[in-house]
């Protein structure tokens, strides 16, 4: 009889976990390193450039709504912010949950410590949107602790979402600015804080270089009028995105 009771308890325990907080986990998958290629249809290289170590993806049902919750574990809060800064788009609400976050019509994205989090609700219903804040709090503490350190030299204040990007390597730099990517082609760097003005095609870039040789090489490329400030391991510049030359199609 005791054995039967133990067996029943063992079988019931997963059900109790399943019912905890009202979240039904339909599927859970974990990916590490190059395993990310098996999950993403393109774009894995960008995440790997930022040093993602682990992705936990869950398809869940919460309050009758379907969600896909993805938690990417990054080396640092700055790396988490960097990948976040490249993926947010059309935010209806920003930095409202006690951390850096962006709510769009079908997705909530956030930076929580060294984690980049994406919660997609494909229905786009008002019910799904209303419950998404509660859902993310069940998995992560949205307390703003271990927030990314945005350099004060940039002069930016919260909300940070959409105001600045953190670029870790050639792939992310190319996605932000073609002219900056060309400037950094032969200058090793460790990270770039990028502030762009789409209307004027102007930008500012705080570039942290790998060594003094890279700093010297970069300084020689940049006009004095474009250098805002320079330190031992960084150079802060302003620039303008160059327009692509129009192809010559004759009279057509």
Task: List PLM regions with ranges.
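Compositionally biased, low-complexity segments enriched in small residues
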Residues: 1-2, 149
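Soluble, non-membrane globular domain cores that form compact, hydrophobic packing
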Residues: 13, 17-68, 72-252
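Sec-dependent signal peptide recognition
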Residues: 2-10
């Amino acid at each position: 009889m005791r054995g039967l009771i133990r067996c029943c308890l063992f079988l019931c325990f997963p059900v109790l976990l399943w019912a905890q907080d009202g979240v039904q986990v339909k599927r859970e998958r974990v990916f590490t390193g190059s395993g990310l290629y098996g999950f993403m249809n393109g774009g894995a290289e960008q995440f790997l450039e930022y040093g993602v170590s682990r992705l936990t993806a869950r398809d869940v049902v919460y309050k009758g709504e379907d969600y896909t919750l993805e938690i990417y574990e990054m080396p640092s809060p700055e790396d988490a912010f960097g990948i976040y800064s490249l993926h947010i788009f059309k935010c209806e609400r920003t930095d409202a949950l006690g951390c850096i976050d962006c709510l769009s019509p079908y997705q909530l994205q956030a930076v929580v410590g060294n984690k980049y989090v994406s919660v997609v609700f494909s229905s786009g219903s008002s019910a799904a949107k209303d419950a998404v804040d509660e859902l993310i709090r069940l998995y992560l503490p949205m307390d703003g602790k271990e927030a990314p350190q945005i350099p004060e030299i940039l002069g930016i204040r919260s909300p940070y979402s959409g105001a600045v990007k953190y670029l870790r390597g050639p792939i992310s730099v190319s996605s932000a600015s073609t002219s900056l990517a060309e400037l950094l082609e032969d200058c090793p760097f460790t990270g770039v804080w990028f502030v762009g003005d789409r209307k004027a095609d102007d930008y500012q870039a705080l570039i942290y270089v790998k060594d003094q040789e890279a700093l010297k090489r970069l300084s020689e490329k940049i006009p004095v009028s474009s250098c805002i400030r320079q330190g031992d391991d960084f150079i802060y510049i302003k620039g303008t995105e160059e327009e692509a030359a129009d192809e010559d199609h004759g009279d057509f």
